[in-house]
From Swiss-Prot:
It is a multi-pass membrane protein. Keywords: Chloroplast, Hydrolase, Membrane, Metalloprotease, Plastid, Protease, Transit peptide, Transmembrane, Transmembrane helix. Its main location: plastid. Residues 1-64 form a transit peptide. InterPro entries: EGY1-like, Peptidase_M50. GO terms for cellular component: chloroplast membrane. This is Probable zinc metalloprotease EGY2, chloroplastic. PANTHER family: ZINC METALLOPROTEASE EGY1, ZINC METALLOPROTEASE EGY2, CHLOROPLASTIC-RELATED. One of its GO terms (biological process) is proteolysis. Belongs to the peptidase M50B family. Probable membrane-associated metalloprotease that may be involved in chloroplast development. Residues 67-143 are annotated as: Disordered.
């Protein structure tokens, strides 16, 4: 074998000293990697961060083992340190002194069994040689080092896979996060574990969640800039706060093959057609004759405009609230429906929402505006006489389909509302009712509907997911008897079932006034959807009903 070239005079004794010096290095490694109880070689996953070197000090060869290892937690570290200390105290282990001369460039034949001294750090292509002679690739040995290899995929609920390669979060970064980003004044970390696209930290939250989140975020930006994103969430397993840090590159917005504006425009054109079709009773009875009688669609313009106005106000309110809270919305997709004209619009949130209150503001703004305009128009329809003096002749039994509309009809029309007696009303009633129904079905607390987001913002992820499952189940049962419910539950299941993307900080609850608005919206939507069970004519009450 060859030793590193030294500038010293050759002699046989110096060569023997060099060989003995390298032997001492081997014994130090043996002492540091042997199991203390049995003396057997330890199969530990190690990462050698330095190397063995030969140094010249005052004409002496000094062999130093400068290894820094990270053993697995199964070994007894204290006993290993004691054994290493005993060996290091022996002069035969620490150093070998040669008074005259220096090492030759090559060793004698007696030292041919020794291995070459590695004077360079291990590279990723090197292998780690175990004491018992088994060679393990360095890439396998590094798996036991505390370096997190994050799997490609959804970093958090609601996030989509965007990366083609995995993201590596080094141990040094995790240590900085634990020791310098988090702290006793914000979030005291007790443990951490890989969490899909990042690292989940468990611990104790200190102070108000919103203020603690702001402090942690500022420290994170000071250390790493915009490289990482912090989420402060509730662990659904134990309902305790957890902090999740993920690389921002895993949070890239989802891209689509078809431009959003093109798809949205296509859906919008079809929705206009179904809104017109919905307000032409002659075509409703025979849909196949629609294309042969397109001129009849002009009769549905006024009804389509009223319903579209209610839907439009709903979406405009979403946009204004989102602009006020810094939330970015995608292009709305209007969903056509031949039964009621439209199911409203599907609007994605494309950035990360700051907290639950901001989500509640945006989610509640649409139904609040839509319900307000629809309710006013419904009242006007009951109060104002038909413009042509004739109006629209209907069977009063239709009002039993909605508790809200049936109650208003009974309150305003009074004795004129009788079972089995035809009634002439202003068509504005039906137009406004359709707009209210569209807002109501979007207020169902399920998935990523407005109602689902409202429930999430008010009660958190765990409770809202249970409410969502219950709502979808009840909607599925009603789908057996109602075709509108059938198509709506199918649409929710395939397009809107969630989960809702994580918020930056999900712990702080909204203010009570916003919660009151959210509850009112859910109740109002329920009144629109539930049937009116009471007869309109008191004379038709039976003894059983009384």
């Amino acid at each position: 074998m060859q030793l590193p070239a030294m500038s010293c005079s050759p002699s046989q004794s110096s060569a023997a000293a060099a060989a003995a010096a390298y032997g001492c290095c081997q014994r130090i490694l043996l002492a540091s990697t042997s199991l203390p109880a049995t003396g057997r070689p330890a199969r530990l996953g190690l990462k050698l961060r330095s190397t063995h070197s030969l140094q010249i000090r005052n004409r002496r060869f000094v062999c130093q083992a400068m290894t820094e290892t990270e053993p697995d937690g199964d070994g007894n570290g204290d006993e290993e340190k004691e054994e290493l200390g005993d060996d290091a105290s022996s002069p035969s282990v620490d150093s070998v002194t040669q008074e005259n001369g220096s090492a030759e460039s090559e060793t004698n034949a007696d030292n041919t069994k020794d291995e070459t001294v590695n004077t360079e750090p291990l590279s990723s292509s090197d292998t780690v040689q175990n004491i018992d002679g088994d060679a393990t690739p360095a890439s396998d040995a590094q798996e036991n080092v505390e370096v997190v290899d994050v799997a490609v995929g959804s970093p958090l609920p609601g996030m989509k896979q965007q990366l083609d390669e995995s993201v590596r979060i080094p141990k040094a970064t995790i240590d900085i996060l634990k020791d310098q980003v988090f702290g006793f004044d914000t979030f005291f970390v007790t443990s951490q574990e890989p969490y899909e696209g990042g690292i989940l930290f468990k611990g104790n939250l200190r102070g108000q969640p919103a203020k603690s989140y702001e402090k942690i975020t500022n420290r994170l930006q000071n250390k790493f800039g915009d490289q990482y994103k912090l989420f402060l969430l509730i662990n659904p397993e134990d309902d305790k706060p957890v902090a999740v840090v993920v690389p921002r590159q895993t949070l890239q917005p989802e891209t689509t093959a078809v431009p959003e504006w093109f798809a949205a425009a296509s859906f919008g054109v079809v929705t206009i057609f179904t809104l017109l079709l919905r307000n032409v009773p002659l075509l409703q009875d025979n849909l196949l004759s629609t294309f042969d009688n397109l001129e009849l669609l002009k009769d549905g313009v006024y009804g389509a405009l009223v319903t579209a106005a209610i839907i439009g106000v709903h979406e405009i309110a979403h946009i204004l609230a989102a602009r006020d809270t810094g939330i970015k919305l995608a292009v709305p997709y209007f969903v056509p429906s031949w039964q009621i004209g439209s199911f409203g619009a599907i609007t994605r949130i494309v950035n990360i929402v700051r907290n639950r209150e901001d989500l509640l503001k945006v989610a509640a703004a649409g139904p609040l505006a839509g319900f307000s305009l629809g309710f006013v128009l419904l009242l006007l329809g009951f109060i104002l006489p038909p413009s042509d003096g004739l109006g629209l002749v209907i069977d009063p039994a239709v009002f039993h389909e909605s508790f809200l509309v049936g109650g208003l009809a009974k309150l305003i029309l009074g004795d004129a509302l009788k079972e089995g007696t035809k009634l002439s009303i202003n068509p504005l009633v039906l137009w406004a009712w359709a707009g209210l129904l569209i807002n109501a079905i979007n207020s169902i607390p399920a998935g990523e509907l407005d109602g689902g987001r409202i429930a999430f913002a008010m009660w958190g992820r765990k409770i809202s997911s249970r409410i969502s499952s219950l709502a979808i189940g009840l909607l599925g049962i009603s789908a057996l008897f109602n075709d509108v419910a059938f198509y709506w539950v199918v649409l929710i299941f395939f397009l809107q079932r969630g989960p809702i993307s994580p918020l930056s900080e999900e712990i702080t609850e909204p203010e009570n006034n916003y919660i009151s608005i959210g509850v009112a919206i859910l109740l109002f939507g329920l009144l629109v959807c539930l049937p009116y069970p009471f007869p309109f004519d008191p004379s038709q009450l039976t003894d059983f009903d009384l």
